[in-house]
Amino acid sequence: MSMLGRNPGEMPFLDHLEELRWRALWSLLAIVVGAIVGFILVDRMEAMTLLIRPIEPFLEGGKLKYLSPTDPFFVTLKLSLIAGLVLASPIVIYQIWSFLAPALMPSEKRVIVPALYMGVVLFLGGVVMSYKIVLPMTLRFTMGFQTEFLEQSIVIGPYMAMVTRLLLAFGIVFELPVVILILSALGLVTPEFLASKRRHAVAGITILAAVLTPGDVITVTLMMMAPLVLLYEFSIILSRVVTRRRRVAEAAAGAQA
């Protein structure tokens, strides 16, 4: 029997596990439905055409090649799964939030809820930046090495894998302020700690950018590093604001006690 109608904060341990199981099942169902809807949208909205557009100027006849008759289908399937994850993400986040919210303080909820909305904006901002700026520059750089002695044979599978990886990578790393904001609201990190670890953060950002971006294009790595460093500094500012409010609230609660 589902435990969704009960308050997780008042449940025994086994009921917590039951609640978690149902939340996970609803999330999985949302992803499956999202993938089905994504398959329809990818086909009708010509999502593949949109992703191919940045490389069209470099293609003979404006078309990509494929090596197997099944390649177009599997590429469409992968795009549908990615679209399904994106479409289902609000429901998945809601399920996670519904499970964790009863254990949070009202002051923490007031910070985390707006942070989740900000996360959507930042994710879309990262994807748009990648598609409009980073991807075209990457293609111009890599295709600039083509000579008369080389014949291009750009295959749809590897190209789509590179594009989706780049778009998702920028979308995900742009969530850094949201993560730090939530951790600050929970009291797990402080602005003093973040500022003292700035050098370590830059080193970590460098490694992360190198892992997430195409390894043979150093320009793309640098283009991911620059906004990430700025986002880290912005996160420190957000952490100061949230931590100051949290400390004031804790002091007021202590005075009343």
Predicted features and spans:
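Membrane topogenic/interface segments and analogous intrinsically disordered interaction regions
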Residues: 1-257
